[in-house]
């Protein structure tokens, strides 16, 4: 099959990670894959077998989107691409428009609980809609076409395992985009109440809230305890040499970071949100998002006793199964 993947950018995030891993594996299985995005820091992680083309598919401008559609349509006609897989809302509009011009099918993967507004209008016109969790599917249920399913995202198996000798070192780690929805501000406030305890926090990620979070850590006198590393391609290695992952998100479509912690074996203190609860199997050691007092208590309990969630790997979707499921959707659409 000749498959086009469209996403806004290849900067830091779970959508980007998913598209990169899926595209790389599809080419290993003999398919031709073209990724269209505005580029970004993670672009170099695409396999040499994956074709990448830059277009401003991240811009929420109807004229720009139409021009992108015209360009993609010309590539489809000249090069024989067979199917479009869109990720995020602007790419969905572009895919719908392009499909109308070229008569090739398109599908959409919903990665998060987006606002229920005009941005989701194209979904009713998709050949298939994939949601990354039951939570996301339930959220967009009124926007779905006839054909839809849940395919949880997954990561290739990690090459590292957690070194349990780090449990007692109280070396916490946060991995994720620095936006309000990720909840790092709650953790920083909680840690501010524990600044006399023996701990450190490594923050891996970048985003619009970085400067504000750094300032707040400084105001609370935590600059010597919290290190903001920015984006790092060594997340797995650093997680394997940490004591515990802190995952304070307010909402997640799936939650690749705690899933990765499960693969590595790293203990987790996480928010009590539906996607995490399903992974963990119970709400023991889960904390309400935004609850500073609750996070303070959970972190102090870990420092004192080492207690945290150890995510069962059996609850984590396998990467091979995820790719198989996507491949099956592609095949079914092309055979119709």
Predicted regions: what is each one?
Residues 5-66, 207:
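N-terminal strand-loop element at the rim of the active site
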Residues 126-161:
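Donor nucleotide-sugar binding/catalytic pocket of nucleotide-sugar-dependent glycosyltransferases
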Residues 16-21, 170-193, 208-214:
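A conserved mid-protein helix/loop that constitutes part of the nucleotide-sugar donor-binding site
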Residues 65, 86-92, 110:
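Short His-centered aromatic/hydrophobic patch
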Residues 100, 104-134, 142-143:
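A conserved, positively charged/aromatic
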Residues 35, 267-270:
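Short hydrophobic beta-strand element within catalytic cores of glycosyltransferases
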Residues 231, 250:
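Aromatic "clamp/platform" in nucleotide-sugar-dependent glycosyltransferases that forms part
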Residues 285-293, 300-306:
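Conserved acidic donor-binding segment of nucleotide-sugar-dependent glycosyltransferases
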């Amino acid at each position: 099959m000749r498959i086009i993947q469209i996403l806004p950018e290849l900067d830091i995030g779970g959508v980007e990670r998913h598209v990169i891993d899926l595209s790389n594996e599809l080419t290993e299985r003999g398919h031709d894959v073209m990724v269209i995005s505005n580029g970004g820091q993670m672009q170099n992680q695409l396999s040499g077998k994956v074709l990448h083309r830059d277009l401003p598919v991240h811009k929420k401008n109807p004229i720009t989107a139409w021009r992108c559609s015209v360009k993609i349509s010309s590539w489809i006609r000249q090069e024989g691409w067979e199917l479009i897989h869109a990720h995020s809302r602007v790419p969905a509009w572009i895919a719908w428009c392009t499909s109308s011009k070229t008569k090739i099918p398109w599908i959409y993967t919903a990665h998060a609980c987006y606002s229920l507004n005009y941005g989701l209008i194209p979904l009713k016109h998709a050949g298939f809609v994939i949601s990354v969790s039951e939570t996301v599917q339930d959220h967009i249920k009124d926007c779905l076409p006839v054909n839809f399913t849940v395919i949880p995202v997954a990561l290739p198996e990690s090459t590292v395992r957690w070194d349990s000798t780090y449990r007692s070192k109280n070396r916490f780690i946060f991995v994720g985009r620095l936006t309000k929805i990720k909840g790092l501000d709650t953790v920083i406030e909680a840690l501010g109440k524990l600044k006399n305890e023996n701990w450190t926090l490594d923050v891996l990620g970048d985003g619009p809230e970085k400067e504000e979070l750094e300032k707040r850590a400084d105001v609370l006198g935590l600059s010597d305890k919290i290190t903001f590393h920015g984006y790092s391609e060594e997340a797995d290695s650093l997680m394997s040499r940490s004591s515990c992952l802190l995952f304070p998100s307010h909402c997640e479509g799936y939650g690749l970071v705690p899933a990765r912690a499960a693969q590595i074996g790293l203990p987790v203190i996480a928010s009590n949100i539906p996607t995490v609860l399903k992974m963990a199997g119970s709400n023991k050691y889960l904390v309400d998002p935004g609850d500073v007092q609750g996070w303070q208590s959970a972190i102090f309990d870990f420092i004192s006793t080492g207690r945290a969630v150890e995510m069962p790997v059996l609850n984590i979707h396998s990467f091979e199964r995820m790719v198989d499921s996507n491949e099956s959707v592609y095949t079914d659409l092309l055979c119709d």
